[in-house]
Amino acid sequence: MAKPVVAIVGRANVGKSTLFNKLIKKRIAITQDDPGVTRDRLYMEAEWQNKYFTVVDTGGLEPKSNEIITKNIKKQTELAIETADVILFMVDGKQGITPIDMEVADMLRRTKKSVILVVNKIDHIKQQDNVYDFYNLGFYEIFPISASNSMGLGDLLEAVVSKFDDNSNTESDDDITKVCLIGKPNVGKSSLINNLLNEERMIVTDIAGTTRDAIDSKINYKGNEYIFIDTAGLRKRKKIDTEVERYSVVRTLSAIDRSDICVLMIDATEGVSEQDTKILGYAHDQGKAMIILVNKWDLVEKQTNTMNDFKKDIRTKLGFVMYVPIVFISVKENKRIDTLFTEIEKVDNNYSMRISTGVLNDVISKAVLLNPPPSDKGVRLKIFYITQIEARPPKFLVFINRNDLMHFSYQRYIENQLRENFSFEGVPLQFEFKTRGK
């Protein structure tokens, strides 16, 4: 399900980054080796009253000269209008209205998106009178705040979440598997979509996507129906700069959120990039099924073990998703496209798999005998019971004697045992541990 997107726009030095940090502060739980994209702190999840949304930080857009200020702000605002569900237009309450503020306001008044005017740096009640002048910008909803000391943030967040449509994330065709194509520009995502759309054996119906600029394709392939989500925002442009890339990634994250299977497309002539790692890390964190698709394989000189060597290189760089299948195709030559759908069907079945409690406990009992759990100060970890509580993705509830004894390495061992005994290729496994007395 796609989260609403909240963008903070405004000229430099009005406090956008400070507000961003305040909004996401309680949601930060990132380790240094976290593969997820959110480590960049350009776009992060925030929560208020159990409503989750993505906040986009445009705080890094600090122009180097007066000549490019207007151009940068215009671009920033256009991207916010295009991408966001709610726009926080931030101004400086101490400095007052500037010509750039007026220009941004003029652009925002023409959009149908929800716009909230945020007057920052109102640090004292005596400064409240400064707020009234900002009604000249033409916005009814004005919130005075002090981002640095959190004054007024509660009221602002109340207004933000009130803009979210409770039904806006409701998906039609809930029973149809949704496949999201992700990857860098120019790896062949659009070419693959076009190939699928032009295939005579496929029945295609264009449907309106729930994201702002994506067109989803409903494809019937050999009796199986899928919805392919094309991340249109990542299509190559003549120039990809910081602002455009930032919002493009937000569109991709939104597409991942509402998908079931994420297909990461890689250019065989370039290999795995840092962006690939981050985007796949986000899909992994969100519990999505995954496939790695290597395109342009026709351009690679073939030698003995070429494909195996390429797979090893991918596994080395994407070690956190060793369970994900790797498929090699050539969209241009129309080769091995069938293998992609074979893997999609297989991974989708794995994603929905449910295993009976009795079978699960038999497997875990044997695993414990083969490799006894760790102990600490004479107390050994005991696994009493395991049961599957969810599918898509599979989630397991494990009852143990002490949580602190369940080391990461032993959890990985349990996961590997499940993967060896059941077909979970392409699917992340999730675990919840609960303590229980003897």
Swiss-Prot record:
Superkingdom, taxonomy of origin: Bacteria
Family: Belongs to the TRAFAC class TrmE-Era-EngA-EngB-Septin-like GTPase superfamily. EngA (Der) GTPase family.
Key words, A-Z: GTP-binding, Nucleotide-binding, Repeat, Ribosome biogenesis
Functional description taken from the UniProt entry: GTPase that plays an essential role in the late steps of ribosome biogenesis.
Keyword match GTP-binding: yes
GO BP: ribosome biogenesis
Residues that coordinate or bind GTP 1: 10-17, 57-61, 120-123
Protein's name according to its UniProt entry: GTPase Der
Domain annotation KH-like: ranges: 353-437
GO MF entry, a single one: ribosome binding
Residue span, EngA-type G domain: 4-168, 177-352
Subunit structure of this chain's protein: Associates with the 50S ribosomal subunit.
